[in-house]
Amino acid sequence: MQNHAKQKILYLESLRGVAALIVAIFHFDIGSIFNNELTKNGWLMVDFFFVLSGFVISFNYLDKIKSFSDIVQFQIKRFFRLYPLHIIMLFIFLVIECSKYLVKLKFGLSSTIPAFTYNNLNTFITNILLLHNLVDNRLTWNVQSWSISSEFFTYFLFGLIILFSARKKLIINILSIVIVLLSFYFLQNHSMEPKYGFIRCLYSFFLGVLIFNFSNSFKFKITNYLSYIFFILSILLVIIAEPEKIIGINIFLPLIFSAFILSLIMSQNKNYLIYLLERKFLIYL
């Protein structure tokens, strides 16, 4: 079972790589053949990441967190995985803000948004502490780092739930369902914008926790055609998704992503999607 599960992780890593590529193209906003509806809505792949993270983190740590010191060690590992690049990018943006200020001071040239208007001392401190997506009312500095802030504290909440539930799956599942439902309700009445990123992360991450527990509890196999259907449905819904400020179908995407991942995990042998995703060039991606 363990070896089989580890084999499954390989194609999930490939999915992570493909999603990362789509997100990167979305942020670079490059033209040509890459400028299409799939990449224009590539921001939704972040939610795919969150679902995957919920599954993978549960797979690796659900049975390992037995004390508060285990949570601390878990958070330290997450910290050193997320923080180094975040702090490097933060100081790069600090250099940019200082350059804008000096150019204004010396040459009288000002940018559309003057230096340190939003990227100021207060938001710099919240970014240093990874609190920015939880407490700031807008995105600042390296705006894409909102997901890092959200993930870090979602991981911490996950650790607390595992610890205080004594790893009892029924309690974990009930709490996960409550978090998913409350997050869904909140987002439905607001939006999927990054300023609500923490709630968005909770929603998708704990869906990932739920599909891990489901796949780990029920060993039956389902037809491969379900994974093909959910794969096509995921792509189609991303293509026709609404802008971030409009809820529309966007709020249902994490549910479809979860169904797709679960259908892969519980699929029968000779699944062509798994065969493709286990090719080395995709794993290395």
Residue ranges and their predicted role:
Residues I9-L12, Q73-F74, L82, S147, ...:
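Alpha-helical transmembrane segments and their helix-entry boundary regions
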Residues E13, G17-A20, S53, P84-L90, ...:
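Residues within membrane-spanning alpha-helices of integral membrane proteins
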Residues A20-V23, F50-V56, L90-F93, T123, ...:
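Helical transmembrane-bundle signal
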Residues Y83-S150, F184, L255-I261, I265-M266:
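Membrane-interface helix-loop-helix regions
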